Amino acid sequence: MKVGVIMGGISSEREISIQSGNSVVHALDKDKYEAIPIVLNEKEDLIEKVKGIDFALLALHGKFGEDGTVQSVLKTLGIPFSGCGPLSSAICMDKDMTKRILAFGNVRTARWEMVSSVDEIDYEKIENLGYPVFVKPNNGGSSVATTLVESKEAVKDAVLEALKYDTEVMIEEYIKGDEITCPIIDGKMLPVLAIKPKGKFFDIASKYGDGGADEFIVELNEDLHKEVEKMALETYKLLKCDVYARVDMLVKDNIPYVLEVNTLPGMTKNSLFPKSAAGINMSFEELLDTIIEKSLKVNRE
C-alpha cells in the first residue's frame, strides 16, 4: 500500500509538522507500506502530490492541515486519510466553537471572551475572569503566540501579537492546576499523561524542545480517573472525532477542566501520543498501524 505522509504546509507549525512527518516515514512498517514523503510548500501542491497514493497519513498541524481543509480535498478526491473528518477537524481547530459545544454539553472548560480587534477589548469582562489570563489566537496550536498576561496593562500588546496569527483572539481564564492529556484511539482512552512544564506553562519550547517539560504516565486516584475518562470520551463524542485525538485538561482541586482537543497530535520523538501508547506496550510502529487500520474503516461518504 502506498502511504503518502503529508507534512509541511503553510501554517506557523510547518517545521513541527515536518518533524512529525519524518518520524512517521521512518517508523512505518516497510513490509506493509511504501512510505512516500509528501512535503507541501503551498496549497496548490496537494492535488498534484497525492496522485497515485492509496492512503494519506496526515502529519500536518495548524491551518490548512488540522482545520478540515485538507481532509475535505482528500474526501473529494476519494483518497482515504487518517484521523478525524473535515467537520470535526474544523470545529476542534476553532477554540471558541469547541468551548461553546463543550459548554452546551455540560463539559467543564475555563471561562473565556473573544475579540477581533483591540477596540473590542472589554477590560471589565477580563477583570471578571481574573488575572492572569491567557491570550491566544483562536485558530492555532502548539501555543504559538500564546501569552500569559498578568495585568490590564499587558492585554493590548498580547492581543496585537495574537492578531498577527489570526483574525480572532481568545482571552481565557487561567486555571492554576495540573495539566494532563488524554490520548484516545478508536473510542478508548490510553494512559493519561501528566505534563510538568519547566516554564510558566506548556508553551512551544516546552512542547517540542528536549527537556522543556516532564511528561509521564500518571496514576490518578480512582474517582478522578473515572471522571477524566468520562469527560475525555464525552468530549471526543460531542466534537464528532474519529479514529484518534488527544484531549488536553487541567485539574484543579481534583476537578478536571477540558482545555482543547488536538485532532492531529504531534508525532515527533518528543510527542505525547506515542509516549502514552508505550504505556500499554504499543510501539510507535504499532500505533501507526492502528491509526491506518481504523482510518480505513471509517465511512467518509
Swiss-Prot record:
GO terms for molecular function: ATP binding; D-alanine-D-alanine ligase activity; metal ion binding. Residues 99-293 form the ATP-grasp domain. Its cofactor is Mg(2+); Mn(2+). It is found in: Cytoplasm. The keyword Nucleotidyltransferase does not apply. Mg(2+) 2 binds at E260, N262. Mg(2+) 1 binds at D248, E260. Keywords: ATP-binding, Cell shape, Cell wall biogenesis/degradation, Cytoplasm, Ligase, Magnesium, Manganese, Metal-binding, Nucleotide-binding, Peptidoglycan synthesis. Pfam families: Dala_Dala_lig_C, Dala_Dala_lig_N. One of its GO terms (cellular component) is cytoplasm. The keyword Magnesium applies. NCBIfam families: D_ala_D_alaTIGR (TIGR01205), PRK01372.1 (NF002378). Belongs to the D-alanine--D-alanine ligase family. Cell wall formation. HAMAP family: Dala_Dala_lig (MF_00047). This is D-alanine--D-alanine ligase A. It comes from Clostridium perfringens (strain 13 / Type A). The gene is ddlA.
